[in-house]
A protein has these predicted regions:
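Short alpha-helix carrying the canonical HExxH Zn2+-binding catalytic motif
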Residues: 216-229
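Short linear interaction motifs
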Residues: 126-152, 203-206
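N-terminal low-structure segments adjacent to metalloprotease catalytic domains
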Residues: 1-136
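Post-HEXXH active-site segment of zinc metalloproteases
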Residues: 3, 218, 231-261
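Active-site scaffold of zinc-dependent metalloenzymes
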Residues: 150-218
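Metalloprotease/metallohydrolase-associated module, dominated by Zn2+-dependent proteases
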Residues: 159, 167-170, 252-266
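Short loop/turn segments at strand-loop or loop-helix junctions that form parts
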Residues: 164-169, 226, 235-236
Length: 266
């Protein structure tokens, strides 16, 4: 990655424990995705695991072998419980983010835990590269990720802070720019042209790899302000929505409630 990321590595045992819980989450709930979405998420998980850039495409046979092995692994662990986390010789529950991160946020990494679509468990462990304040809300910019699961939301609110995950954001932007190139919408073409990505009407792939990090820096405020909106929105608070989704996961009720809250936040 070309962004200025410090080498701030968490304890190896903690990394393994968080990643194991990520794997269990994927094993339990990968069925919430369509086949197409699942393959795309697995492809990016493979790239992350192998340290590949978003534009580096694996050999199809190698990727399929990896997916087959991953599905077999999921069958082995799907019924396992999440593993407590070990920190300084003591254990703590997987949802105790304050115990892992420290109440003063002094550690150079952050542990994220929560729930996403259809109450899929979200875990990750990432290095903190910068602290910002926007609209009086604390914002943490995250860099290298040492553990992650398949969903990998680009940004989230945790303990009153907005967390922005640079690695998933880079994969997301790259994939969506590939989709934009076939669109004839003038707004999409304007976006691509503003970064000099159109050459003779076609997407300049080489230029994209060179400017992807800058695009991530320039566009991340869109995700930050959305999360700030969710943090400040109180007509449909996060706890009410969490209970609603927990009662009706994967339903029209969940999707409508998420859409309403997104609109209110924006």
């Amino acid at each position: 990655m070309n962004l200025p990321i410090k080498n701030l590595v968490p304890d190896e045992q903690l990394i393994k424990e968080v990643q194991y819980n990520c794997d269990i989450s994927d094993a339990r709930d990968h069925g919430i995705y369509s086949m197409c979405s699942l393959v795309l998420k697995l492809r990016n998980l493979y790239k992350w695991e192998k340290g590949l850039q978003p534009w580096s495409e694996p050999e199809a046979a190698e990727l399929l072998d990896w997916i087959e092995a991953r599905e077999s692994y999921w069958e082995e662990i799907a019924q396992q419980e999440f593993r407590p986390l070990t920190l300084n010789g003591r254990t703590c529950p997987v949802d105790d983010v304050n115990a892992v991160n420290g109440n003063n946020g002094a550690r150079p990494y952050i542990y994220g835990a929560g729930h996403g679509r259809s109450m899929k468990a979200i875990f990750f462990l990432a290095e903190v590269v910068d602290h910002l304040s926007m609209e009086d809300c604390p914002v943490l910019l995250l860099g290298r990720e040492h553990a992650r699961e398949m969903a990998s939301p680009l940004a989230m609110v945790q303990e009153g802070q907005v967390l922005v995950r640079t690695e998933p954001l880079r994969y997301f932007l790259y994939d969506h720019i590939q989709e934009l190139r076939s669109s004839c919408r003038s707004s999409y073409r304007y976006f691509l042209s503003s970064y000099g990505l159109l050459a003779g009407g076609e997407l300049d792939q080489q230029k994209l790899s060179a400017v992807l990090d800058q695009i991530a820096v320039n566009e991340r405020h869109l995700f930050i302000y959305h999360e700030i909106g969710e943090l400040l929105e109180d007509s449909l608070d996060s706890e009410t929505q969490r209970r609603l989704i927990g009662r009706f996961p994967g339903s029209v009720i969940e999707f409508v409630s998420r859409a309403v809250r997104d609109v209110l936040a924006d």
